[in-house]
Amino acid sequence: MADTPSVEPTRIDPKLLELLVCPLTKGRLEYDSARQELISRSAKLAYPIRDGIPIMLPEEARPLAE
């Protein structure tokens, strides 16, 4: 039997989260560990985190449902 590696969600350093802002609104971001995204409520966008790296490009962000 092959063991499948367990994938643990990446943790974001709280200090990094304090420094990062939405590139469009310059507002604060919320970390969604379940979806591995940084949420900008003001821009209504969710920026993905890939391999532990936040992708802060608006064209890569997912629009949030109203």
From Swiss-Prot:
Gene3D superfamilies per record: 2.20.25.10
InterPro entries: Trm112-like
SUPFAM superfamilies with a match to the protein in the record: Trm112p-like
One GO CC term on file: cytosol
Pfam families with a match to the protein in the record: Trm112p
Family assignment from sequence similarity: Belongs to the UPF0434 family.
HAMAP family documented for this protein: UPF0434 (MF_01187)
Protein name stated in the entry: UPF0434 protein M446_0487
Organism (species): Methylobacterium sp. (strain 4-46)
Lineage of the species this protein comes from: Bacteria, Pseudomonadati, Pseudomonadota, Alphaproteobacteria, Hyphomicrobiales
